[in-house]
C-alpha cells in the first residue's frame, strides 16, 4: 500500500504540529523514546512485580498464625493483621481447613489463589463475590476475543501503512500510519462497532446471572419523612392509615431519633468496658498491671515526667467506664427529646404497603393523597413515602442530617471535587506542572527510557490511586442514609472522575492548567479546536497509555496485595495506642469489608482506557487482557484472605455493567474524531462512524433502561412472599433479633453481663467446667479476647444466615 506525497507531508506536518501544541512545556514525562519505551517499561514492571511478590511472601510468612487468636492477643507485630489469615471472619468450614493445610509453603498462597475453586470463594465470601468474579470472567473472555481482530487485522493494517517512516516503530502500529485514501479504514470503523455489540451481548448475558434476592422483596415497611415531631402516640399514625386506606393493617410504628452522640458515647463506653475486663482478668493471674495512658507514651521511655507516669490499668479503665456510662445514660435520657421527622411503618402484608406507596407517588406533583380524620394533625399531605431499606442497610447516625442540609453538603463537596480534579489535579496536569518548574531537568538529561517512560507511567498510576481515594472518602462525608446509596454514589463518582482524569483530558492534550483554561474560555483558542482532538492520535499519547496499563497490570496489582496504605494507617494507630485492649480494638476495626464499589471503578477505568485505544492503538489490547487476569487473581486472594464478607445491593453490580457498556463508546468517539479530522465531515467513513455511534448510544441506553426495569420487576413482591421477622406481628416477635428492628442498635441492645466469667465465648476453646481456678481465669481471659476479636465474624454469620445486604 502506497501513500501519496500529500499524505507524507501531512503526516509529518501533523505530528510536528500536534507535538508542539499538545505538549507546550519541555515535557520530560509526556514524550517518548523509540517504540514508546514499552519494552523497557514492561521488563521493569515484571521485575518489580516479582520483587513485590517476594516481599509480600516474607511479610505474610512472618505474620502467619493459624490459631489467629494468640496472634491478636500477644503479637504486636505491625504486619500481624494486615498480612495474616483473617480466620475470625468466617466459620471454619472443611474447605477453609483444607486451604490452611495446603497453605504452608513460601509461595503456596499464590498457587492456591490460582487453583482455588470458585465454590470455595463463594462459600466464604458470599453471592456478591460470585457476581464480581463472573463479571471479571465476562470481561476477560471479551478482551480475549477482541485480541484476535486487534492483533490479527488492525495491527498489520496499521504497521504496513506508509504514512510514517520506518524509524517510527511505535507510531507505525497506530492508525496514524494508515493513508486517508485507504479503503482499509472501513475495517477500523466496522470493528469498533463490532466491539461494542460483542461487549453489550456479554454484559447482557452477565445480567441474566443476577438471581433475585428475597431480602429485596420482603419489605412491608414504608419509610415516611416530614412527619411532625410533636406526634408521640403511634396510635395516631395507625388511625390515619386505618381510615384513609380501609383494609390496611399497621402492625408496627417506629419513631426515629438523633442518636449521633449516643452512638459515639456507646463506642467509647464499650472500649473502656473491654479494657476493664481485660485487665481485671489479667490481674487475677499476674497481679496488678501498670500502664502509661498518654498517647505518645511509646515515644518516651522516661518515667519521670508527670504526663508519662504509670497508673493502675484496672482502676483507670474502671473510672473511665464509670464516667462514660454516666454520660451515656444522661444522653440516653435526652434522646426522646431529639425526635426526627422520620418514621417506619410496617403493614400486615406487602400489598398494603404497595397501595400506600402508590398513593404518595405523585404528591410532589400536587396530587393529594387520601385523607383521614387526623390528617390535619399528622399533616399527611406533607409526607414523602418510600419503601424502607433493610434495617442493616441504614446508617442510623446519618438520619439526623435533613434533606436540605444533605443536598447542600452533597453539592458543596462535589463542586469542590469538580474544581479540584478537573481544573487543577488531573494526573497529567500534575506531571506537566512538575516539568514547568524544572523539577525533572536532571531526568531529561538522562534520556533513558527507564526513567522517561517508567517514571511517568508510575506517576500516572499513583495519582489514579491517590486522587480517587479523596473521592472515596468524600462519600462518607456526604452522610448517606443507607450503605447501598453510599456505595452506589461512590462507584459512579470514582469512575467519572477517573475517566476524565486519566482518559479524556490527557488524551485531548489538556495537560496543563493554562492550556485547559485557554481551551475553556479563550474564543480565539477555540478556533484551533481541531488541534486538541489531534492529540488523541499522537503516537506518544498511545504509548503513554500502553505504559499506564502495563504498570496497572503488574506493579498496580502487586501493590494491591501489599496494601501499604492499610499498613501505614494500622501501624500509626497501633503506635499511638495506650494499652493492649486498645490494640485489640484497632485490630478488630481494621478488618473491613471488600470495597466492591472502589474496585469496580478502578477496574472499569483501565477497561475504558483499553477500549478507547483498542482501534487507534491496538497493541494496548493484550496488555488490557493481562491487567484483567492479574486483577482477577489479586481480587480472588484479597476477598478470600484479607477482607470480610460483604453484602451489597444489586444496584452496585448493575452500575458496573453500565460502565462496562459505556467503555466501548469511547472507542467509537475516538474513531469519529479521527474520521472528522483526517477524512472530513462529509466522508462516507465519517458518516458511517457517526451513524454507528448514534446506534450504539441508543442500544446502550435502551439496554440500561431495560435492566433497571428488570430490577424493579424483581423488586415487586410476589403473591406468596416469604415472611421475615421484622414484618411479623408484634405478638410473634418475642424472640426477634434486635438487629432486625427499625430501631437504632444503640437503643435496643440489652445490657451486657460485664463479668469475664459469663462470657459466651468462655468454652470456645474446649475448657472444662471442673478445671482449677487458675485454668478458669486463663480460659476467661482467652474467652474474653475471643469475644473482642470475633465481632466481624459474628456479623458475617448473621448476615449470611439471614441473606441480608449492607
Swiss-Prot record:
Assembly and binders: Monomer.
Modified residues annotated as Phosphoserine in this record: 77, 80
Domain of life: Eukaryota
Gene Ontology CC: endoplasmic reticulum membrane; lysosomal membrane; plasma membrane
Subcellular location: Endoplasmic reticulum membrane; Cell membrane
Organism name: Homo sapiens (Human)
Tissue localization of expression: Expressed in podocytes of kidney glomeruli. Significantly reduced expression in patients with focal segmental glomerulosclerosis.
Protein name stated in the entry: Osmosensitive cation channel TMEM63C
Means of activity regulation: Activated by hyperosmotic shock after mannitol treatment.
Keywords for this protein: Calcium, Cell membrane, Disease variant, Endoplasmic reticulum, Hereditary spastic paraplegia, Ion channel, Ion transport, Membrane, Neurodegeneration, Phosphoprotein, Transmembrane, Transmembrane helix, Transport
TM stretches of this protein: 38-62, 127-159, 183-207, 404-433, 449-478, 483-519, 543-575, 596-614, 618-642, 650-678, 684-704
All ranges on the Cytoplasmic side of the membrane: 63-126, 208-403, 479-482, 576-595, 643-649, 705-806
Pfam families cross-referenced by the UniProt entry: PHM7_cyt, RSN1_7TM, RSN1_TM
Disease in which the protein is involved: Spastic paraplegia 87, autosomal recessive: A form of spastic paraplegia, a neurodegenerative disorder characterized by a slow, gradual, progressive weakness and spasticity of the lower limbs. Rate of progression and the severity of symptoms are quite variable. Initial symptoms may include difficulty with balance, weakness and stiffness in the legs, muscle spasms, and dragging the toes when walking. In some forms of the disorder, bladder symptoms (such as incontinence) may appear, or the weakness and stiffness may spread to other parts of the body.
Catalysed reaction, written as an equation: Ca(2+)(in) = Ca(2+)(out)
Record's keyword annotation contains Metal-binding: no
Family: Belongs to the CSC1 (TC 1.A.17) family.
Keyword Transit peptide attached: no
GO process terms (BP): glomerular filtration; monoatomic cation transport
Membrane-topology annotation of the record: Multi-pass membrane protein
Cross-referenced InterPro entries: Csc1-like, CSC1/OSCA1-like_7TM, CSC1/OSCA1-like_cyt, Csc1/OSCA1-like_N
